Amino acid sequence: MQRLNRTDKEVIFMKCDLIFYLARRTSYCEKALKKQLEELGMGINAVTASTTPIALGEKLITSLSRCNLVFIIGGLGFTGKNGLSEVLSKALSATKVTPSDIKKLKNELGKQYGYLIRCGNQMIVALPDKPEELSSMFSPALVSFIKNAFGL
């Protein structure tokens, strides 16, 4: 986390990574996420895309090595071995993440839930690849959780 001085006040500014996984409407989703993050005093460090579980794992490892917060957009509507829920479940089975570290994010506008996964000082937020759903899932509760987790 770095501090940036802006005019007469000090602002905390934190960067996070964004990974698109089997996502559509990526440009619209990126704009929607940026808008939500700006309100938190956050920005996007890097944007990458993945179309396979292995590539997603590699990108996630890279992202978590440089950022404490990573957003994954897409893949929630897929089932089987390529579905994001299945991929994250397998990846996290070898970590210290417990069921209490995973929160389901309700989607008022669609069928797919989002997920918030916290392990130590790092967090992964998985959201659907529909901008209107993504924006609505950025509820006051999620914003508050992110702010509290990172001291924003």
Please describe what each predicted stretch is.
Residues 11-52:
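Glycine-rich phosphate/diphosphate-binding loop of Rossmann-like nucleotide-binding domains
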Residues 3-13:
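Short, Lys/Arg-enriched N-terminal segments with co-localized hydrophobic residues
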Residues 21-24, 50-61, 74-75, 127-128:
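Structural motif
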Residues 61, 65-70, 78-151:
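Proline/glycine-rich low-complexity loops and linkers
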Residues 2, 27-31, 39, 58, ...:
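Intrinsic structural disorder
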